[in-house]
Amino acid sequence: MTSQQTAFPCAIVPSSPAECRLLGLYQQRQEGLWMQRVKIIGGILTHHQWAALADMFRRFTPSTPLLLTTRQDIEFHNLTTETIPLLQAELAHAGLTSVGACGDTLRNITVCPGNGLCHDTPDLTAIVLALRGYLESYVGIYSLPRKFKISFSACTKACAQPWINDLGFVVQRENSAVTVTAIGAGSLGPRPATGILIEENLTPEDIPALAQAAIRVFDKYGDRQHRAKARLRHVRERCGDERFLELLHEEQLEVKREAPPQMPPISVPDLHYNHVADLNIIYGGLTPDQAEAIAALIHNHAVKARPQTHHRISLFARNAAAARNAVQTNPLLKQLADGPDVVSCPGTTYCAHALVNTHAVEKALRLQVPDTKNRAVRISGCPNMCAQSGVADLGLIGRIRKDEAGNRVEGFMVVTGGGMGTTAAMAEKSHDFVSSEKIPELVKNILHETF
């Protein structure tokens, strides 16, 4: 939970683009309209917050849905400079913040939705909140060379995708002990690469020093002149893996000499929660009515509703049968309870960087390919790969070509075989360019022939 004193709502929209981004603001492709990103701290929203978000969407952006992102954030679209300060004040009142949701800083720390709920998994909420507070106290945290992303997974399934984060912690219970594996220096973008194993058999007490060391190495050696080569991964590539790990270890020793704060203990609760369902959010967009239905489900049936990083919301409950019945008997939720594993970025609907209409392709796939055989199909509107296409089972990356008459044709590079960031596997190119209207048939064929 974020207090009103630490949410920092703005009184006016800053004139500096960098300051806007630090407040989670981006200008849309539509002139005069803005996107506001909001962090879901610890991957958790209370029923009060779901209800408050529904109310805010009705009042501030009634014509657009509440958009989930692939990093446990929420986005408002079609805001104006007049409505942004009002919205940020409402967010702060609800215990939500947009500070650090965008920009060259520590982004939202993502957490696998099943932590502390799936059988025999540690509860990571307390350590994630404490680590966030510790790292945000670093003097250079809001002026890093580029964004810095951290994730936490609660078992070896690595649902929080450590291999595509700047730093990913995989926390697991082994007998009576909790051990940690650290993976780092991976990222997507136009030239994506997964990370490397940093260290195994760490203790939870090692986490703050390693995380602080990684940020300091990034701050010292990150390329501030070339944004396309400014992630921690590029530091590793310039130095080589061996020297990069040496720099990290040296900085880690220095941080330990400063005696970083002790983190809360990681416990493995015996809560007996069961997985109820995954709500499959088309385009990542929820209506206010659906958000209110989720709030009621949490409040009335003691359900834990945890956003994933794949436009889905995982539902857990002690009384799974009653919760499942509540989902199936509510038309607003039942329509979200199944569907193919297809995720698209906002594309040309909102994003100024997008090349193609991703939502149209997602809609076509959901209609024409209703069964993706449990394979992840990811649709990105440009080479930045915000939909994580570069590590998908089947990824589409937006491109533009011209036909013989010189007309612009929207289409995609097609890649296959990725590990979705849960492993080091990158997707590999299978088709250089396929026009948008031919994508559904191609996806059908690839799913039939490959998986």
State what each model feature region is.
Residues 78, 82-83, 91-94, 219-270, ...:
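Terminal amphipathic helices with adjacent charged low-complexity linkers/tails
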Residues 144-241, 390-451:
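Mobile "lid/hinge" segments at catalytic clefts and subdomain interfaces of large enzymes
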Residues 17-19, 258-285:
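Active-site cores of enzymes that catalyze phosphoryl transfer or operate on phosphate-rich substrates
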Residues 25-30, 62-68, 221-224, 268-274, ...:
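Short, flexible, solvent-exposed loop/turn segments with mixed acidic/basic and small polar residues
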Residues 12-30, 96-103, 266-267:
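Intrinsic, low-complexity N-terminal interaction/targeting segments
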Residues 29-37, 190-195, 273-278:
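Gly-rich Lys/Arg/Thr-decorated short loops/hinges at beta-loop-alpha junctions or inter-strand turns
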Residues 2-13, 33-179, 209, 279-406:
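Small-residue-enriched alpha-helical segments and adjacent helix-cap loops
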